[in-house]
Amino acid sequence: MSAMDDSSAVTTFTAEPVNSKENRALYEARKKIHPKRAEGFYRSLKWVVMAVTLGIYYITPWIRWDRGPHAPDQAVLVDLANARFYFFFVEIWPQEFFFVAGLLVMAGIGLFLVTSTVGRAWCGYTCPQTVWVDLFLVVERAVEGDRNARIRLDQAPMSASKFAKRFAKHAIWLLIAVATGGVWIFYFADAPTLAHSFLTGNAPFVAYATVGVLTATTYVFGGLLREQVCTYMCPWPRIQAAMLDENSLTVTYNDWRGEPRSRHAKRVRAEGKHVGDCVDCNACVAVCPMGIDIRQGQQLECITCALCIDACNGVMDKLGFERGLISYATLAEYDANMSLAGSKRINVAGDNVWDRAAIEPDQVRPEHGKLNAGFKHTGLSSFIRPRTLIYIAIWCALGIGLLVALFMRDRLDVNVRHDRNPLYVVLSDGAIRNGYEVKILNMKLEPRSFRLSVDGLKGASIWLAGAQDTNGQS
């Protein structure tokens, strides 16, 4: 729950981190997390990213793109029946799958670049799990209320009101899950046609099965499992942790200015006593969708969504302190600031860590309560360094190579194969007949006519034994 600090008018939350070594046993039932709604720059950024990503996913299959009478008019289509992939003006054939492979490699390198610069920004902002959990939380807050109201509802005995709220929430979740699964199949067939067939019961069984599976996974992962998918099921946190270095941005509690904590920091400081900026209000814990306390340091569960930054900045504004007690920072920047604050490294269980107790508040605010101007803050140097430049160079080289290959590719493919049995036939007049299978792929969107001829063999002629035409393109 929450209470008002009498000295600072800052709301203090009774919030304990769920995902911490002290509170999590090896075999233990899930402890439900009730994240509080956050407000601030990063929350607004997440709203924008969520709206854009969901909009792209749900709207894209319905966008039309005129390719002429001999090709589908859906802008983005994976045409499994005809072995084609359409993306606006680009048409990819099976033998050109290296374009798709190249795009996947570029996506991987782009993800490496993002991780090396801004940490787990993919997890915090654009990962489908994060986006759909955010969407489900919007529904949960709209139906059941914010954090305190949801906690009270969970603790209350079952009643008509509680049942109605739970039923409404899960019903809306299921509608979202069905819509998510339904839209997915529209990427593999003409969306309006398949939608009509689906609603009238005439769609293929695989369409209904796919929607059913995706509905179940969306509902379970987004509504029920939530943070457990990130913590236990997804391998990416472990991979990303190995890709971070001392110049990668991560969400960091700057204990060099936050320690020692006091819930009456403003009053105690006015009395001439030395305390840090953290008032131990637990606002950062209350808003965290992963149920961690960022003040305990870097943790596997942290998806760097930065909602704790928004919550803490709001508290700092109320206290009249500088923002940034929790901020995006690099390890190199953090180490330099801890050293400037007078902290020393000590050995704890074999780890060389900074001693918070050694922080000297006079070093943090040496003059008139202002932060020491020597403290480092994130600059362009954390983004522009050899590692990121190499990633950018490789990414650009791949992109340019794919573009050149795309615009220089042949729009005609001819395959000639000799019949194996018999190799040849001697006719009654002594002539020799050879059989060949000729496959002509017209890779343009309009029909074309082709002429076959034989060069270098005097008196040779060609007979057409049979022909197949597929959609004017082969």
Give the role of each language-model region.
Residues 439-444:
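Asparagine-centered strand-capping/turn motif at beta-strand->loop junctions
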Residues 400-423:
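Hydrophobic alpha-helical transmembrane segments in integral membrane proteins
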Residues 2-261, 309-310, 322, 326-396:
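Membrane-embedded alpha-helical bundles of multi-pass integral membrane proteins
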Residues 256-274:
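Membrane-embedded translocation segments of transport machinery
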Residues 445-461:
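Short acidic, flexible loop segments centered on an aromatic residue
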Residues 115-130, 222-237, 268-316:
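Cysteine-centered iron-sulfur cluster-binding motifs in ferredoxin-type domains/subunits
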Residues 464-474:
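Intrinsically disordered, low-complexity Pro/Gly/Ser/Thr-rich segments with frequent PxxP/GP/PP motifs
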Residues 431-436:
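Short, solvent-exposed loop/turn segments enriched in Ser/Thr/Gly
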